[in-house]
């Protein structure tokens, strides 16, 4: 993947950069692997905003991705590398020898014409999926399951990769991209390699309108609001926030306060993320 930088023909173009999309080989998605995606605009089933700053954006179809990789022992050929508007990574269209087609997250280095396979007896090769127990130590992996048979939920964003550090008993020790070290069961599946589209983090949107195309609405500072709307609001001119620690819109401590609460998996974390 390359990045194109425009000449500064306007204020928006001056700081804009876009992907060259040179790895994309197919423009239209596979008809049997898409479904309509209704816009939620950050609302729940009661119509109330649960995620702020969402709304608008270009219409999308959802691409059905195979995160489970549960078609064991059947080889598949990579037919195309495609763009997916619903994620930062590219996706690869696989055609299995039995005629079925599926999408997977495209790892770095996977090309059209390559053959991939999943299962405990698959080779240690980019794009192949195996249980953690069958993967050698030190291997870079992505699309990792947390629960056996649930499908990959970890390390799916563009350019990310985890590393298999150790195996002890029924569990493998994995170092995550965030620096967190955690234990995952050896029967959980993972895919070999690093997620592709590694230059995604270097793309600059350049203008507010491009954020709106992605469905991201403006984020207003608390200090620019009224006191009734935010703890930082009010005052004459640019007033200090008037409290020792910054607060959220709802008066809870912000910045650096842990919000994670998942007791089921907390006990498997060996070292917290950096």
UniProtKB/Swiss-Prot annotation:
InterPro entries: NA-bd_OB-fold (IPR012340), Rib_uL2_dom2 (IPR014722), Ribosomal_uL2 (IPR002171), Ribosomal_uL2_bac/org-type (IPR005880), Ribosomal_uL2_C (IPR022669), Ribosomal_uL2_CS (IPR022671), Ribosomal_uL2_dom3 (IPR014726), Ribosomal_uL2_RNA-bd_dom (IPR022666). SUPFAM superfamilies: Nucleic acid-binding proteins, Translation proteins SH3-like domain. Residues 249-259 have a biased composition (Basic residues). Residues 220-259 are annotated as: Disordered. Residues 227-239 have a biased composition (Basic and acidic residues). One of its GO terms (cellular component) is large ribosomal subunit. Pfam families: Ribosomal_L2, Ribosomal_L2_C. The keyword Nucleotide-binding does not apply. GO terms for molecular function: rRNA binding; structural constituent of ribosome; transferase activity. Part of the 50S ribosomal subunit. Forms a bridge to the 30S subunit in the 70S ribosome. One of the primary rRNA binding proteins. Required for association of the 30S and 50S subunits to form the 70S ribosome, for tRNA binding and peptide bond formation. It has been suggested to have peptidyltransferase activity; this is somewhat controversial. Makes several contacts with the 16S rRNA in the 70S ribosome. This is Large ribosomal subunit protein uL2. It comes from Chloroflexus aggregans (strain MD-66 / DSM 9485).
